[in-house]
Amino acid sequence: MNHSLILKDSPNIDFYGLSDISNRVLWGDAFSVLDKIEPETFDMVFIDPPYFLQLPKRKLYRWKVKNTVEAVNDDWDKFASFADYDNFITSLLRKVHRLMKPQATIWVIATYHSIFRIGKIMQDLGYWILNDVVWVKTNPMPN
């Protein structure tokens, strides 16, 4: 069977079996796609949720290098409040948890703006945090 690497979600699809999604990227709204996958499917889950950077509406200048911060300014990273963001993360983590096998591992990518909120929510939902992995980025935004 010849599958393309990318599988675009469709409202006409009600269910994805493991053979449908194995070694593929599912392109679509995460909340919709996650609901279509059988429970306890994955041994490992990797999520990179919105960071909710809350950058000001004005330009942020980097005085030492004489330029401005080019930040995420897309709708998918905007939330009306911390409560809205927390509700989004809670919903996402519940949906993901349903798909994880009992001994599965989850990796969550975040920034210092959001990782502690996400970690608290994970603990409140019963996730056990084994470790923190810190990637040192030499050109972070804003710097």
Describe the function of each predicted region.
Residues 1-143:
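Core catalytic lobe of class I
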